[in-house]
């Protein structure tokens, strides 16, 4: 079982130009207010004041105020998850189990601040927040695959992340209503979703090996070969 304790040892930083900024303190302070006030401007101003962050600096760090602070909280938890995944030295695990464990790690981290995450998901569910909601889910999926050293360079880069995004988004919604001990029901839910994905992959493989599938892929593979994974901009 994965155990994650609240600790001051973790430091979440972002880079603005050439300046590395520590956001852990303001996120920690905000989490004291969010359960009562939510991710709003009141929480944002209280957190900035208590962290001694000026109004000018706060607008530089969080242009959209409470929204960007909320997203920084989620990104911080993603980074914690990434570090835990990389610490796991069990290289004998199948990829199925590695992905399952990664999702569970992320949920356990979220469970440390469940009310804050609940309010974040509620805010992200509003229609005008759809782009941020989609980006949040995608970024978590991407963080998991990157932490697992995914080396895909073609269309599989996208399909892996899209599939995992579906599993993660459905899991986190299920977790919000889970009151079981040690998140047992959520863990079972994750395994069921992964089983469904594996069953689909099995069907897809059978189709590829069939006569119809081979004929279809003759043309489709030409298109798929043009799709490449994004590359980092080395000119920055």
Model-derived regions, located:
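Short hydrophobic alpha-helical segments enriched in small aliphatic residues
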Residues: 9-11
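Short, amphipathic alpha-helix enriched in basic
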Residues: 21-56, 64-71, 75
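Conserved phosphoryl-transfer catalytic core
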Residues: 76-86
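Hydrophobic alpha-helical connector segments
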Residues: 85-119
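C-terminal ligand-sensing/allosteric alpha-helical core of TetR-family HTH transcriptional regulators
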Residues: 95-109, 136, 140-147, 193
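Amphipathic alpha-helical packing segments from all-alpha helical-bundle domains
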Residues: 128-150, 160-165, 169
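Hydrophobic/aromatic-rich alpha-helical bundle segments in the mid-to-C-terminal region
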Residues: 150-166, 170-194, 200-211
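Long, charge-rich low-complexity segments
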Residues: 203-236
């Amino acid at each position: 079982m994965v155990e994650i304790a609240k600790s001051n040892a973790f430091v979440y930083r972002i880079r603005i130009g050439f300046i590395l900024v520590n956001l852990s303190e303001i996120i920690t302070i905000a989490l004291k207010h969010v359960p009562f006030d939510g991710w709003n401007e009141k929480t944002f101003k209280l957190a900035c004041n208590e962290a001694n962050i000026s109004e000018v600096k706060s607008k530089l760090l969080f242009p959209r105020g409470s929204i960007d602070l909320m997203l920084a909280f989620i990104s911080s938890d993603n980074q914690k998850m990434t570090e835990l995944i990389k610490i796991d030295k069990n290289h004998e695990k199948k990829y199925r189990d590695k992905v399952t464990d990664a999702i569970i790690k992320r949920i356990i981290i979220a469970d440390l601040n469940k009310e804050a995450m609940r309010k974040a998901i509620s805010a992200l569910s509003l229609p005008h927040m759809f782009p941020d909601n989609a980006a949040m889910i995608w970024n978590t999926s991407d963080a998991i695959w990157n932490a697992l050293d995914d080396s895909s360079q073609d269309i599989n880069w996208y399909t892996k992340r899209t599939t995992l995004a579906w599993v993660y988004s459905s899991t986190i919604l299920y977790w919000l209503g889970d009151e079981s001990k040690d998140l047992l029901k959520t863990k079972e839910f994750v395994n069921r979703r992964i089983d469904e994905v594996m069953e689909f992959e099995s069907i897809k493989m059978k189709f590829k090996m069939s006569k119809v599938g081979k004929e279809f892929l003759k043309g489709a593979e030409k298109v798929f070969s043009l799709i490449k994974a994004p590359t980092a901009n080395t000119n920055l």
